[in-house]
């Protein structure tokens, strides 16, 4: 018996030592590399790049190679982009799970940003859906640049005619996330009671409006300074979280969309109806290892044992849903909320502001 405990103790010590070593390795960021020289005949563009993980100061405005034309792709001149929590997770390389895809000591890809809106400059010979001069919006890694190249069938669609480029750039990731959380995961329908926790943020402001467009009765949770904003975009009830804990109230909801992760799933169970659904969106767990994956695991473990549903998901940015959102916006049912606008050279400041976690709606970067 003593031998068994001794072996177990040695194993535990080794596991702790291995974890500490791995943590040390992952927390070590490689030095920022310098920009390579471009051949003299290279077509160039300005773009935000990052060559190492860290704070917003690692983001640099550089000249890099302009995307080359391709038969099945659309070359877009970017007029505006927007920043998302996804961007600063990649910028910092946290949670460490991100580095499994982005690179361990340093990023594999130097490009930054996803959301964009702009004008089609040229199309490949096989492209039939778009033509030069079309105003479009969508998502493509490397959107914080003067140009992006997108597959014809990729995440790009005609821009809503009633939106500016800045407004359209605010849409893709946040609005598609809100749409899919409500429609696909939450199965929202007319007459339901829906609560949006984090109603004044990027995803939240879209979720309030989309839920209302589906006929739901929407309650928004936000801070004191954002009460009027959330009410103005369609919430029939607004709760100030600095004065009231909605999980201690008597109201029960058919669907809760949680964009901020301020309560446990046990808290949410109290205010969900017996057959209600909680949809958790984004980086709810700030842990440096697994981040949102832990929220997904908890939801998966709990759901089989209760009548309520607990879902964690990440959105799939696709062309069809960009079209759905375009229709909602052209019908006047959804309008992007923009907090601040920065120039491309000010992207580090834009990312720093977003990272504080108090943006009202979206943070936009103008490119051209």
Residue ranges and their predicted role:
Residues 102-115, 122, 135-198:
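NAD(P)H dinucleotide-binding glycine-rich loop of Rossmann-like/cofactor-binding domains
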Residues 169-240:
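Mid-domain Rossmann-like dinucleotide-binding core that forms the NAD(H)/NADP(H) cofactor-binding site
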Residues 247-255:
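A short acidic, Gly/Pro-enriched loop at the edge of an enzyme's catalytic core
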Residues 9-21:
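Hydrophobic membrane-insertion alpha-helices, especially the h-region
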Residues 66-82, 96-142:
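Glycine-rich beta-strand-centered segment in the early N-terminal region that forms part
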């Amino acid at each position: 018996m003593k031998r068994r405990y001794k072996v177990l103790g040695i194993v535990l010590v080794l596991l702790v030592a291995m974890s500490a070593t791995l943590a040390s390795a992952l927390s070590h960021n490689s030095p920022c590399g310098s920009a390579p020289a471009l051949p003299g005949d290279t077509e160039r563009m300005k773009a935000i790049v990052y060559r190492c993980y860290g704070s917003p100061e690692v983001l640099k405005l550089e000249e890099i190679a302009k995307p080359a034309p391709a038969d099945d792709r659309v070359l877009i001149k970017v007029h505006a982009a927007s920043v998302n929590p996804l961007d600063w997770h990649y910028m910092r390389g946290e949670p460490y799970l991100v580095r499994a895809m982005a690179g361990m000591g340093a990023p594999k890809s130097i490009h930054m940003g996803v959301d964009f809106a702009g004008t089609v400059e040229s199309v490949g010979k096989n492209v039939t859906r778009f033509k030069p001069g079309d105003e479009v919006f969508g998502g493509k890694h490397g959107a914080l640049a003067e140009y992006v190249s997108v597959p014809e069938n990729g995440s790009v669609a005609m821009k809503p005619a009633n939106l500016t480029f800045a407004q359209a750039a605010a849409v893709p990731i946040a609005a598609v996330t809100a749409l899919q959380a409500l429609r696909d995961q939450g199965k929202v329908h007319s007459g339901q009671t829906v609560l949006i926790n984090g109603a004044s943020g990027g995803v939240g402001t879209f979720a309030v409006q989309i839920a209302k467009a589906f006929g739901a009765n929407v309650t928004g949770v936000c801070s004191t300074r954002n009460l009027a904003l959330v009410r103005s975009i369609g919430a029939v009830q607004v709760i100030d979280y600095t004065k009231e804990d909605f999980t201690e109230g008597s109201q029960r909801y058919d669907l809760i969309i949680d964009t901020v992760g301020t309560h446990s799933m046990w808290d949410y169970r109290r205010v969900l109806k017996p057959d209600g659904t909680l949809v958790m969106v984004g980086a709810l767990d700030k842990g440096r290892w697994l981040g949102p994956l832990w929220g997904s695991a908890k939801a998966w473990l709990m759901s089989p044992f209760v009548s309520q549903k607990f879902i964690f998901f990440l959105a799939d940015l696709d062309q069809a849903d960009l079209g759905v959102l375009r229709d909602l916006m052209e019908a006047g049912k959804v309008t992007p909320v923009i907090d601040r606008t920065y120039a491309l050279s000010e992207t580090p400041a834009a990312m720093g502001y977003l990272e504080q976690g108090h943006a009202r709606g979206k943070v936009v970067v103008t490119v051209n």
